[in-house]
Amino acid sequence: MKVLAVEPPSGELVQGLRSLDDGYIPPVFEKWGGYDLLDGKRIVRPRESIEYARRLADECGIFAGLSAGAALAGAIRVAEQLSDGETATIVFIVSDAGWKYLSTGAWTDDLDEAAANAESIIYF
């Protein structure tokens, strides 16, 4: 088993996520082993987070938030990096809901516009 963190680039915001490099260490992360638990990290930009949150809703009927979109983007990236013939069971956690973002344009604006707005809006 491997455990990978998904986070935005240092200094950027993905709502619901912060870069570990920016100094915020979630208490639950420390409680269960912190950096010793991680086998690696995947960096996900705000645009990808919105894009994959939209895909969760459109393709799977899961109305999740932007951090869940980031988690899906990271999981897909891991799957794409598997060698030919290599198999894996990849699990990601949907940790928030889309209702918090209804008034922000994350679901209705053009993707590029929503991504630009996401970098300057604090959703909650």
Regions found by a protein language model. Name each.
Residues 11, 98-99:
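Surface-exposed, flexible loop/turn segments at secondary-structure boundaries
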Residues 67-71, 90:
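Ser/Thr-glycine-rich phosphate-binding loops at phosphate-binding pockets of nucleotides
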